[in-house]
């Protein structure tokens, strides 16, 4: 079965997210993981965050998603515009792990969020069309009835991406969603994400400077101990970008920031 992207629901209004003087601390530690965090994530654009492993990038996403556990303390101001609903209710979150349900088929994993609001096991026909369209776009239409354990790691991650896109939320948090893919598939799915997430507010965690340069409108570098977010640049050109001489210079700037981080 096939359908085009135009069949998807009308996007919800984009949301601007602002963090002022954010501080995140584990209760068993005297030193915060994140401190004096000031960030602006403009509505309908991609904000990419880079930083060394363990600097708190994933904790930042989990805070935005409302997923921090009771062992973590957060202080600071979080502002969203428009503020008509709680941020956690307007977010789709794609973690580093695919988190697929092993007993559900690929198609049913993509439809998982649709099932939460359904009566019994009923899922509307148009939702199945949308899910199958996404599976076709990520190259897994022929695997819709397979179980996750029958897929490779990269294929599982593509299912997770399709499931995230299926939620059609105005804010999308992505924690290294393309890291397990081969180069060709990674580029193709970056292109797909740029198309399907157009006009959404996206916060992307990545270790790959080239990925940030290709996808971001705004780039932050997490630095120091405790970590804070240093704003690096705003990129005006349309995405996804080709990697040219200007991109190579920006990559050198990013690498210099990461290499000289004394955290």
Task: Identify the residue ranges that each predicted region occupies.
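A short, proline-enriched helix->beta-strand linker immediately N-terminal to the Walker B motif
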Residues: 166-170
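Conserved beta-strand-loop-alpha-helix hinge in the C-terminal portion
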Residues: 224-255
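Conserved ABC ATPase signature
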Residues: 147-151, 155
């Amino acid at each position: 079965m096939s359908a085009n992207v135009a069949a998807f629901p009308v996007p919800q209004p984009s949301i601007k997210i602002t963090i002022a003087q954010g501080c995140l601390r584990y209760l068993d530690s005297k030193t915060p993981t994140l401190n004096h965090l000031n960030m602006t994530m403009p509505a309908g654009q991609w904000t990419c965050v880079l930083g060394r492993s363990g600097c708190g990038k994933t904790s930042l996403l989990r805070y935005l998603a409302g997923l921090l556990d009771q062992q973590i303390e957060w202080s600071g101001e979080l502002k969203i515009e428009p503020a008509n609903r709680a941020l956690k209710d307007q977010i789709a979150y794609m973690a580093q792990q695919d988190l697929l349900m092993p007993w559900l088929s690929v198609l049913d994993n993509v439809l998982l969020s649709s099932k939460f609001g359904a009566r019994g096991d009923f899922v509307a026909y148009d939702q199945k069309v949308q899910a199958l369209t996404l599976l076709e776009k990520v190259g897994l239409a022929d695997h819709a009835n397979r179980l996750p354990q029958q897929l490779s790691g990269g294929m599982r991650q593509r299912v997770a991406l399709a499931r995230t896109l299926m939620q059609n939320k105005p804010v999308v948090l992505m924690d290294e969603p393309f890291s397990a893919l081969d180069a060709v598939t990674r580029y193709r799915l970056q292109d797909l994400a740029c198309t399907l997430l157009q006009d959404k507010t996206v916060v992307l965690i990545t270790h790959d400077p080239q990925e940030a340069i290709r996808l971001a409108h705004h780039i932050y570098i997490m630095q120091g101990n405790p970590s804070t977010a240093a704003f690096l640049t705003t990129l005006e050109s349309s995405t996804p970008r080709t990697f040219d001489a200007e991109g190579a210079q920006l990559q050198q700037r990013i690498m210099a920031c990461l290499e000289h981080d004394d955290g």
